Amino acid sequence: MKYTTTTSSMIYVMLFFLMSTFLISAQEKLSKDYAFEQNKRLGRGVNIIGYDPIWKDASKARFKDKHFKLIKEAGFDNVRIVIGPFKFSMNDAKHTINPSFFKTLDYAIKESLKNNLMVIVDFHEHNTIEKDPLGNKGKLLAMWAQIADHCKDYSNDVLFEICNEPNMKPEIWNQIHKEAYQVLRKSNPNRTLIVGTINGNQIMYLKDLVLPEDDRNIIVAIHYYSPIQFTHQGAPWSKKNKDLSGIEWTQSKSEQEAVNLDFNIAQDWSKLHNRPLTLGEFGAYEKADVASRIRWTNYIARQAEIRNWSWSYWQFDSDFIVYDIEKDEWKTEILNALIPSKKK
């Protein structure tokens, strides 16, 4: 057969049509409730390795292979892997990420999946981004493009969270996460994405969040540390609360009502917009009395579950801990508050 220019053009058109059809089919095969199904599977989780030396030197890692297994055996369903890729920039125009970053990320993802833990890859660079959101946008987008491409072949048990606690004006955040969304969807059309609210992922800012109506494969993240005077008392980085002490949480009727009011606002938003919610962080700092921490932690986790939210406790190691790596043992009182009995 003799190929003419016209024939070649027709072949290219047909190939383009077939590829387009394939991509559309790939996106359409997910049910409209897929994000809710994913959120149910996320279940109960914990934040890991954000401040672990593993990122700089694997030989100095506090978090070991065994901890993935321990997390699963304790009854957790997900890990939120806290990543800081800005620290691994090669400082070139393309914001190339040092390969050592991907070595650690791959290790954490693969060990999680091996232990049947779902994974949230949490872009945890809010402290830098908030200083100049638009100025740092290009870096965030460039790095997400690299991470997304690198992770595109992982199963849908891996989720991407665009940015932790984006502290900026709502219109700026809506612009940035929209552009990040477009970057991620190029290489990961079926990946479940997580988008949080501004200013510490606070519930009150759900009303300002604008998401693509035609993409239902998105989970919305909120965080909860209220009352902040209780959860952050004695925390050295918290200017307003570092000198506070002795504040209890007794689970009084008024204290419960305050939590329920906040959570009901979030739940009403979720139902109105048909978007699942994940409680990506919650915890009470160690300076609070243990009995109060147990009561608060248990109440928050149970109220999230009553509303069918997934959750990820802050955090496994470092501070607010649920596991004592030095003693190689669970902080049993916090673990039991989070998971009173293993899910059947």
Q: For the regions a protein language model found, what residue spans apply to each?
A:
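Acidic/histidine-rich helix-loop elements
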Residues: 48-65, 87-98, 229-257
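N-terminal carbohydrate-binding accessory modules
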Residues: 26-80, 95-96, 269, 335-337, ...
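The substrate-binding groove and active-site-proximal loops of carbohydrate-active enzymes
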Residues: 52-55, 90-102, 127-135, 163-171, ...
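An active-site-proximal structural segment forming one wall of the substrate-binding cleft
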Residues: 60, 67-78, 94-125, 129-159, ...
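Short, acidic/polar
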Residues: 57-73, 140-144, 259-266, 293-297
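Bacterial Sec-dependent N-terminal signal peptides
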Residues: 1-28
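Aromatic-rich peripheral "rim/lid" segments of glycoside hydrolase catalytic domains that contact
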Residues: 289-344
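Active-site region of glycoside hydrolase catalytic domains
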Residues: 32, 141-255, 260-284, 306-312
